Amino acid sequence: MAVEKVNSSSSLAEVIDRILDKGIVIDAWVRVSLVGIELLSIEARIVIASVETYLKYAEAVGLTAQAAVPSV
């Protein structure tokens, strides 16, 4: 995948369109502990993409119900 370099500035609409077209995944992991005792642990995976992009890549890695059912 080649990186495109554009000299002009991008508008917000172009940036949002590109994010929805390509998709973005944010993994977050937070742990709060006091004196070695874990008080709070948060794990999150946030996916931002269009439905079409999500289904395209989710099926490839087996995250959809259709991909989870073995073919007969």
Swiss-Prot record:
Keywords: Gas vesicle. It is found in: Gas vesicle shell. The keyword ATP-binding does not apply. It holds the Pfam family Gas_vesicle. InterPro entries: Gas-vesicle_GvpA-like, Gas_vesicle_GvpA, GvpA, GvpA-like_CS. One of its GO terms (molecular function) is structural molecule activity. The keyword Translocase does not apply. One of its GO terms (cellular component) is vesicle membrane. HAMAP family: Gas_vesicle_A. Belongs to the gas vesicle GvpA family. NCBIfam families: PRK09371.1 (NF006874). Gas vesicles are hollow, gas filled proteinaceous nanostructures found in some microorganisms. During planktonic growth they allow positioning of the organism at a favorable depth for light or nutrient acquisition. GvpA forms the protein shell. The gas vesicle shell is 2 nm thick and consists of a single layer of this protein. It forms helical ribs nearly perpendicular to the long axis of the vesicle. This is Gas vesicle protein A. The gene is gvpA.
